[in-house]
C-alpha cells in the first residue's frame, strides 16, 4: 500500500510539472512555410501570435504538413476534418470558409491585398489608356482562378471572367491573349513578372491603374480546435493593438510599396458584396490606407 501511495504521488507531481503541461500544436501547410517573402510573412504571423500568448496559454509548436502547396478547396476539406492535415490556414476570406471554419476577423495583412495592379500583354497597353471607370473596365476579359476570392466578387460585379485551371497557366494564357489582364496584389506582381521574364517577355505591368477591392486576409481555424482559435485571436489582437503587425507588414513589403508609387495611378473601386457583417471595416486602425500612409511604420 505504501509503495502504491508513493507511486501515485510521483505520478501526480510529474503530471503537474512543466514537462507535462499542455502544448498547443498548430498544423499548417507549405503555403504558410517560409520559402519566400510572402509565405515567410504568414509563418511569422502565426509564430508571433503564439509566442505572445505563452504567459496565458503555455507552450506551443508549429508543424508544417505536406510536400507542397495545396489547392484552397483541399485545404478547407482538411481543415474541417477531425485530425485533418491542417488546423490553421491563412487565406483571403470567402463566404464558404467563414461559414464552415472558424474565422479570426483580424486582417493579418491589414488590407494590403485590397490594392491590385494589372498584369497585361504589352500590345494591350493602349487599350488600358482609355480606361478611367469601372464601366469601361468591365467589358475587358479578366483571367482568374475559380478558387480565388476575387472570382465570385468579379462575377457578381459583371466582369468578363475567363477561368484558368492552374496558377501557372494564367501567365501562358495571358501571353497568348486569351484574356486582357490578371489583377494581382501589389506585393505579388513584381516578383511574379520578374520570375517569368524569360518565358513571357511580352507581359508587363499596366502603369496607370490600381483597382481597390476589399479583400481581408484572415487566419482560419478548424472547428475542432477552438482553443487554437481563442489563442490566435488573443495573439493577433495584441499584434494589431500594439503595432506589431503593422511593423511586420512594412518589414516584409516595404520595398514593394515604395516601388508601386500608388499615388500616381488612376483608381477604380470595386465593391465586395461577399463580405460578412463581421468584417471589421469600422476599425480603421486594422487597415492600411496606401493613399494616405507614409511608407514607414
Range-by-range predicted roles:
Residues 32, 112-117, 121-124, 198-230, ...:
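Periplasmic-binding protein-like
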Residues 145, 149-156, 236-296:
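Ligand-binding clefts/hinges and TM-proximal coupling segments of bilobed small-molecule sensing domains
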Residues 16-18:
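N-terminal signal peptide c-region/cleavage motif recognized by signal peptidases
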Residues 67-137:
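Acidic, polar ligand-binding/catalytic clefts
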Residues 65-86, 156, 168-188:
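Short helices/loops that flank or line small-molecule/ion binding pockets
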Residues 80, 87-100, 182-202:
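A ligand-binding cleft/hinge motif common to bilobed small-molecule-binding domains
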Residues 35-51, 118-158, 170, 187:
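Bilobed "Venus flytrap"/periplasmic-binding protein-like clamshell domains
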Residues 21-99, 232:
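Extracytoplasmic small-molecule ligand-binding "clamshell" domains
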